[in-house]
Amino acid sequence: MARSFVGWMTLGAVIVLSSTCALAQTTQKAQVFPLRDTVGLIATKAKMDPVTYLGRPAVRLTVEGEDGDGIAILPGTDFQDGTIEAEIALKPTTPPGVRYPGFVGIAFRSRDASHFEMFYVRPGNSAAPDQLQRNHAVQYVAGPDFGWYRLRREWPSVYESTGELAMETWTKLKIEVAGRTAKLYLNGSSKPSLVVDGLKGEDLHGSVGLWSFTNEESYFSNVRITPAAAMKLENGSDVAGVWELQFGGDAGGGGATMELRREEDKVTGTWSGPLGTGREITGTWRNGYVELIFAGEWPKDSRQGAPGPVHVHLAGWIDGNTAKGRISVVGRNDGQWSAKRKE
């Protein structure tokens, strides 16, 4: 039964193994990679050089070819939760006068060169005259399925943000990961530049890597990985059942019931709540991660616009008998949802 309604609503890879792994310690202690040389590094589609850049030793990565990106996997890393710190810099190699935002970042929980979570930055967007470009200075992605284009189109402004950055300048990054949440900090700030509540990657642990793009020189130095006690999580929870759900956003919130069924990776069911009763749900399931859609009806008593048909999109993780994620009523409201399975 519906509850009351309140006012609502890829990757071409470069794999680099750092020779500084001799300084890496066990996963229970901090692992430090100064990246002072290229001894033992293994590269694909990239040229690597040990350099001194802006006064500090670093590894420079340049991606071979006219288009593509690359990831540098640090050996001996098996990261789940904790902190990753690094210093990065970027120098564009495009002709003078060509606008280039730049792309350089840190990947984590990497299974291989195409499956990973990642934060990257676009220093050239930080001081752009167009505010829209400024809003695209910091980015989260999850390969191979959730690139920047898909995330921006499906969840505008959720997985990218502004940030104080500059070309040809060392930037300190800090990534904090706890379960399905990750935060990115810039240059020692106590406030995160981007918070991702609901990481979309397929794996709960994996390697840490350095990421670069074509038309630039990317520099990396002083990577430090500090593990923390891992949150107890397990992928693969089923979505089938009756779910009591709460949701909300800037335009308000409410409650609903979802009755869901799953056959392999296909999900079907119904939604009953403020946006309609018995509305047909379709979607997908991937190892506990779900994407659900249905056609709803914006309520007549809402103060947030005229009534009419709406498209609703939910995405999130099932963890045992609980679930949470993001909800979008396209063009009307965006927010979060959480649910419990009725037993």
Language model region names:
Residues 1-7:
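N-terminal secretory signal peptides that target proteins for export/translocation
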Residues 3, 109, 224, 262, ...:
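Basic side chains
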Residues 8-20:
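Bacterial N-terminal signal peptides
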Residues 10, 25-27, 150, 157, ...:
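Intrinsic disorder/low-complexity segments enriched in polar/charged and small flexible residues
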Residues 25-238:
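Extracellular glycan-recognition regions
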Residues 233-343:
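Central antiparallel beta-sheet cores of small beta-barrel/beta-sandwich binding domains
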